[in-house]
Amino acid sequence: RLKVRALLIDKYNRNFELLKHKLGTLRITKKSAKWIAQISVTIPTNEKTGTKILGVDLGLKVPAVAITDDDKVRFFGNGRQNKFMKRKFRSVRKKLGEAKKLNALRQLDDKEQRWMQDQDRKVSRGIVDFATDNNISVIRLEQLTNIRQTARTSRKNEKNLHTWSFHRLAQFIEYKATLVGIKVEYVNPSYTSQTCPKCSEKNKAQDRKYKCQCGFEKHRDIVGAMNIRYATVVGGNSQSA
């Protein structure tokens, strides 16, 4: 049996709160010359009762848009900044590849992954806080099996789509929501970005604006979130990406 002394640094006083609960298995792994300790924690939760639903649309230009039952809307993340950073990482990666600096490439990949995870943590925390502030009982997301086919993309952001993990963001949302007793459900994503929430006719948005012949107009991602809010819930909470 090996005893290991560890220094726990907790900038936001979150981990110390977790240590108050029942601790489980300790797992130690090595990544990029650093040792990482992971401890499972059992946290009791009380699922919220009620019928208030939050629809959340995930994307690239706008990382997330959420809308409540009473039509309160919140945008999360900065798609332009994310796109700029992805291009920056890609440019540096190309130069390192041409110079055959493999160790530097691995370090850059790790740095990019940490940055993306940090963005997803911030977005997921914002969504769950917004849900809590509005007494939401259920958060609804698109079923991730088909999100890559339904995400609004163009050739110039196709590379970003294939390197950004909607699956990870959904997991972060589900994890944080569970801690505060909010249920997460997944819905059929078919036509959520095309169906008019007012008259149910299907239309294609022009750039970022959705406009229907019935007179309804909204930001296209708000339309997606509105339709996700009341779309058909699918079984199994599929999260394959």
Predicted features by range, described:
Residues 167:
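Basic, amphipathic alpha-helical segments enriched in Lys/Arg and hydrophobic/aromatic residues
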Residues 1-159, 170, 174-241:
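Metal-dependent phosphodiester-processing active-site neighborhood
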